[in-house]
Amino acid sequence: MRGYLNSNYKEVKRSINELDPSISSNLLNPDAIFANNEMSLEDIEVYGFDYDYTLAFYSKHLHTLIFNTARDILINEHRYPKEIQRYEYDPNFAIRGLHYDVHKALLMKIDSFHYIQLGTVYRGLNVVPDSEVIEMYEGSHVPLEQMSDFYGKSSEGNTMKQFMDIFSLPEMTLLCCVNEYFLKNNIDYEPVHLYKDVKEAIRDVHVKGILYRAVEADIERYICYGERTQAVLSKLSNHGKKMFLITNSPSSFVNKGMNFIVGKDWRDLFDVVIVQADKPNFFNDKRRPFRKVAERGILLWDKIHHLEKGQTYKQGNLFEFLKLTGWRGSKVLYFGDHIYSDLADLTLKHGWRTGAIIPELKSEIEIMNTSHYIKTMAWLQGLTGLLERMQVYRDAESQMVLQDWIKERQETRDLTKTMFNRQFGSIFRTDHNPTYFLRRLSRFADIYMESLSSLLNYDLHHTFYPKRTPLQHELPVCSEQQYANTFRIPLGRETAPIK
């Protein structure tokens, strides 16, 4: 029986090594727009945008600034040991979408079924052995009542916090660095206090204006020049589309950034500009009225009866916004990078169409397009298929072979994980399952893309169609990949610039 199993193994291995070269010519376009829900740009009359990581993209220096400033706040204001100052920001440590167990001080990746991906649980800067994780959680499943709340936050009864926005990468890294220092030096500490102190320090970097002043003082260092952003806004304006901006950032910060990215006449492109909106409260709290922001940031006390083009408004709420503009339902498309704060309420409660900006998408697709990744994934699928078919052989000799295959399968999984991030892998997958992050992305975003510049690849009559993937009980009659191979069509490359 061992010989029969090995011959099947070798046959699958041979077929993988002889993969049709045409597969390498049918790669995904990193600049494409991907659809979770069918949507036509022809139906969109109004385009809305967040500012940070949607219109404005930041350099790597910004996360270092946030990390260093928050670390120093812990030392100077919360009396943390000065020795933590030796820790520096590592941009390759954390990824977006991770969960943090506030009471256990553990950072981890969780899949769409609430299962922890073993091998991605970190205490400090070191991975926790799988056996210890299973003992702590009595398995690898996290019950619903322990998960983060609707907006990814840790609240009463929820012991998990999910880090969803790009600004959270320094926060995760700082949490793990301070944890690491305490553990290495055998210092007894309360994990809840550490979490709250780091959270407050990170918040102070924003709320006290430290980040805003630093960026405004050296805008070329921190903001990536937005020539493509300017092109997108200009094209939409030339096609007669209404546009608005709703951001949590302050007026002077947005103004300086947009002057740099678009030009001093940037307000001429927008019909409505709202700053310090306090999303997601902006979408739910009816009590806060708009205030007009005059020159030099002076707030006027006039009652707002109209939202005027060329003016800037602070706070307010979506219900008043809808009343004053009449922009309702599926004719509005809003873009943001934060799945919860920017998109969730809009799609669930107000019927707006939503677009998620996922900067990590491009680098992940570029990895998936490599021949090494393609062959590794093909072998992983082939090996999994072998295990599924050959598990019926229960004799001792066959089971020894199967155990070797199971071990190799896990090693191959670990290899694919490290291709994206050595600690946590892809932000979209936990082994074979989607991540919790992707589950929320799929639910709250009609379309998603690496940046707004992807819109330049499509005309404004384009309809985005989600790929039909067979359900587990459905027969895969003809996949898109097979169709593309048949007609030699490069996937995701059938795009035309806006004219």
UniProtKB/Swiss-Prot annotation:
Residues reported to bind Mg(2+): 50, 52, 337
Cofactor note: Binds 1 Mg(2+) ion per subunit.
EC class name: hydrolase
Residues that, per the record, bind substrate: 199-207
Matches recorded under CDD domains: HAD_cN-II
Domain of life from the UniProt record: Eukaryota
CC cofactor: Mg(2+)
Family stated for the protein in its record: Belongs to the 5'(3')-deoxyribonucleotidase family.
The protein's name in its UniProt record: 5'-nucleotidase domain-containing protein 3
Species of the source: Xenopus laevis (African clawed frog)
